[in-house]
Amino acid sequence: MATKTQKTNPRQTERMRLRQELAHEKAKMAKRRLITRIVIATVVVIVAGLVVYGVWSARPTDSTAGGQAPAFTLQTTAGTTVSMSDYRGKPVLLYFNEGAGCGACTQQMAGIEKNPGFAQAGITVLPIVMNTRAQIQPDLDSYGVKTPYLLDDGTVSKAYGTLGKGMHAGLPGHGFVLIDGSGIERWQGDYPSMWLDPAILLQTVKSHL
């Protein structure tokens, strides 16, 4: 017996084609939504990581050393020479900072100058930068800072372990080193936020003497 051939209905064929196209389009849309979700989730994770890292890296750190402070002799912006031995018997607070171009660093020193508590406590603050006089003096004049800055070629900053503590590997960060009258390091603090209220700084320093 001969097999009867089924004729394809054009309407059915068109409906099948439309259903296939619709299914294909839905699959593409679902894939796009999935990719979008993955991208958004990735961005959220990256941003959250950056925020956590930023908060973590901006935390102040401090330590009590207790060792003999490295000796040094440096030229100043005033054209004089300063040595650690000049302050034997007196507490000294070294202020290492990024120097020229760092407005927050210069503002910090301006704030310290305005606080009479340091002088009243007999504490001498020596700001140290890796600049020449020509580089740093305009900043000091701009912020009205009168204290002479000590000009370091990096030797002293390295000796005190302050290099790379800020945004630049080859420069000091924003840190302080307290040396007592016997030449002993009593405290070291680093502040990546580039600012420490002078009143809090004074209180912290006095608590370590």
Describe the predicted segments one by one:
Residues 38-53:
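Hydrophobic membrane-insertion alpha-helices, especially the h-region
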Residues 82-106, 111:
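Short active-site neighborhood of thiol/selenol oxidoreductases, capturing the structured segment around
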Residues 32, 37, 53-84:
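N-terminal "domain-start" segment that seeds a small globular fold
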Residues 145-147, 163-177:
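Structural micro-motif
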Residues 171-209:
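Thiol-/selenol-based redox modules, centered on thioredoxin-like
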Residues 106-145, 154-158:
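Structural microenvironment flanking redox-active thiols in thiol-disulfide oxidoreductases
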Residues 1-19:
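N-terminal intrinsically disordered, acidic low-complexity segments at the extreme N-terminus
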Residues 18-30:
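Juxtamembrane low-complexity tails/linkers enriched in Ser/Thr-Pro and polybasic
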